[in-house]
Amino acid sequence: MTTRWLEITCDIPADLADILASYLGELSGTGVCTENLDVDAFSTDEITLSAIKTVKAYFSEDEDVDARLEEIQNFLDRLAEQHPGLSIPRPIISTVQSEDWSSSWKANFKPLRVGRRLMIVPTWEEPPPYPDDIVLRLDPGMAFGTGGHETTRLCLELLEEIMDGMPILLTPAVLDLGTGSGILAMAAVRLGAGRVVAVDIDPQAVEVARENLALNDLTDQVECDTTPLEALPGTFDVILANILAEELVRLAPQLIQRLSVGGMLVLSGILAEREQLVRAGFACQELEYRETRRQGEWVAMVYRRAARA
């Protein structure tokens, strides 16, 4: 098992950090850490953004480091070309131990309030919640979804609003597609959902999600596995799909098929520049477009499945 990792560090303007982090996450296939965001706060209103962020990616020490550095530098050069006048420093490489890597991202993951009542708390923290808080304990491990990223926050905020708007006696079925850490599925249960299904194509993400479900005593209340969307039985009153824009468009027919009449569909993981691509992909007479929410460079869209004529 690898105990030493190559850490590649890039300093970049804050408004491009998410784009770089997404690229490095796909390139490394392991982990990415974004720093210089003051998350030592209980409300997103208190978060302070710095002008420059530091994005760190981790690779096995067996990797061809020169080849990886060249790929990353080429990506940074393309970013600079798209933003005239932008100067991006060359990446810095260092070697870290596994335990150092773990400490690095933990230092930047603090309790976070999302929406009106949701409080996301890492397992190593114990903040005093307000009486009506819905506390979700989380150890994200290598899976995406701490609640700090814009795409996850958008989903959580919209989920809370949708669930609060449901009739009191209704316990809706909820699907969390691309569950990552399991945070959306856990929030759905705590917000009053009945059947909750969480799926991800990444077995490691499913394992992390199951561990987080156990931390919150929700193992028996969420079906969590790698079942493909097309193989899931039944329909859902709420579907949360926080995945890449291109995948959302590809899965549009299946998502609509799994959404019950009158059900709500939340699409996230969409860069603002991909918004029209997704809007076109979901231009279906069975769906009513409801709204678009924006945070930073990211958007989330809400649709409702209309009754058949």
Swiss-Prot record:
- Cellular location(s): Cytoplasm
Q: Does the keyword Cytoplasm apply?
A: yes
Which E.C. number(s) belong to this protein? 2.1.1.-
Q: Which reaction does it catalyse?
A: L-lysyl-[protein] + 3 S-adenosyl-L-methionine = N(6),N(6),N(6)-trimethyl-L-lysyl-[protein] + 3 S-adenosyl-L-homocysteine + 3 H(+)
Sites binding S-adenosyl-L-methionine sit at 152, 178, 200, 242
Task: Give yes or no: UniProt keyword Methyltransferase.
Answer: yes
Quote any Pfam family the record assigns. PrmA
Alphabetically, which GO biological process terms does the record hold?
A: methylation
Q: Report the GO terms under cellular component.
A: cytoplasm
What main location does UniProt list? cytoplasm
Q: What GO molecular function annotation could you give as one example from this UniProt entry?
A: protein-lysine N-methyltransferase activity
Q: Which keywords are on file for this protein?
A: Cytoplasm, Methyltransferase, S-adenosyl-L-methionine, Transferase
- What is the main EC category here? transferase
Coiled-coil annotation reads: none
Q: Which family does it belong to?
A: Belongs to the methyltransferase superfamily. PrmA family.
Give the protein's function.
Methylates ribosomal protein L11.
Q: Which PANTHER family match?
A: ELECTRON TRANSFER FLAVOPROTEIN BETA SUBUNIT LYSINE METHYLTRANSFERASE
User: What protein name does the entry list?
Assistant: Ribosomal protein L11 methyltransferase
**Source organism of the structure:** Pelobacter propionicus (strain DSM 2379 / NBRC 103807 / OttBd1)
Q: Which gene encodes it?
A: prmA
